[in-house]
Regions:
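Bacterial Sec-dependent N-terminal signal peptides
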Residues: 3-52
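All-alpha RGS (Regulator of G-protein Signaling) helical domain and cognate RGS-like helical scaffolds
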Residues: 32-228
Length: 228
């Protein structure tokens, strides 16, 4: 799974994000406590913050990043929803609910900038991006093997999500995009820690596939994040 997933990640990044630009320094926008342990975003509070920030011109890389993250967050939600139905493990239900708020947060930005939504009315397991469509089927098949495999799928998704968000933030300088991506990253770090605990409790182990070992260790050894 690791080799295939790395190839998929490369296709996603090469096809959807122009991530060769140098990293930009960022000014974090402070906020009230808007995310809990499972990363459920307070969308009302976030909308107020997003709407208070200026509409700035979007680069093609920023637009492509928003389109990708809208569906990548849906991918996480859909896989977790499906694996919860298979195994009944509450962590999948809890984090699927969080991922709904994550994909809704990206939709907030698409709406603000009048970008057509790639999700529209697509049901669970249906994606506009063919790479994500294939990845959904791959991850569900892997997660259906056993509950331990399912937890590892969850960790892999969050590993990839944190990696992609970090790369997307290097080419996004709009304040509202930076705010939303920061919130998504915070939630994804909590999710990764949750899945890792479940992997250990099931007698398994996990080696990061996209993050460095040092980045992964820093996440799993830190307290759960609960707000800015």
């Amino acid at each position: 799974m690791k080799r295939v997933s790395k190839r998929v990640a490369s296709l996603l990044l090469a096809g959807s994000l122009a991530l060769l630009s140098a990293s930009c320094s960022k000014d974090n926008t402070s906020s009230a406590n808007s995310t809990n342990e499972y990363g459920h975003i307070n969308l009302s509070a976030l909308r107020t913050q997003v709407n208070s920030l200026p509409n700035e011109p979007l680069s093609p890389a920023e637009t492509n990043g928003l389109l990708l993250m809208r569906e990548e967050e849906k991918l996480a939600r859909d896989v977790y929803t499906t694996l919860y139905q298979k195994w009944g493990s509450q962590v999948f239900s809890n984090i699927a609910g969080s991922e709904q708020t994550h994909t809704d947060a990206v939709l907030m930005l698409l709406t603000k900038y009048n970008i057509a939504d790639p999700v529209a009315d697509n049901p669970v397991g249906v994606f506009s991006n063919p790479v994500l469509q294939n990845l959904y089927h791959q991850l569900v098949a892997e997660g259906n093997i056993s509950v331990l495999h399912a937890y590892k799928v969850g960790a892999t998704i969050e590993d990839l999500d944190i990696f992609d968000l970090a790369n997307a933030m290097t080419v996004a300088d709009n304040q509202d995009i930076d705010l939303v991506y920061s919130m998504l990253s915070k939630g994804s770090r909590n999710h990764l820690s949750s899945f890792y605990r479940n992997i250990l409790n099931a007698g398994g182990s996990y080696t990061p596939q996209y993050l460095t070992q040092a980045e992964f260790d820093a996440i799993i050894n830190s307290p759960m994040e609960t707000g800015f």
